[in-house]
């Protein structure tokens, strides 16, 4: 999940340097979505992680 987030982040940073538009804007939107989903999954796993039986 974080690998995809990093890939989309790099694409989004390149898109930001060149101006958001078309496919670049879509990649930036996808990077935001993947980042938020990754953070939510991290927080869920943090609170429901390994507990002693």
Curated annotation (Swiss-Prot):
Segments forming a coiled coil: none
InterPro entries named among the record's database cross-references: DUF1328 (IPR009760)
Stretches that traverse the bilayer: 4-24, 27-47
Localization, UniProt: Cell membrane
Domain of life: Bacteria
Xref: Pfam families: DUF1328
Alphabetically ordered keywords of this record: Cell membrane, Membrane, Transmembrane, Transmembrane helix
GO cellular component: plasma membrane
Membrane-related topology note: Multi-pass membrane protein
Keyword Cell membrane belongs to the record: yes
Record-stated family: Belongs to the UPF0391 family.
Name the UniProt record assigns to this protein: UPF0391 membrane protein KPN_04833
High-level lineage: Bacteria, Pseudomonadati, Pseudomonadota, Gammaproteobacteria, Enterobacterales
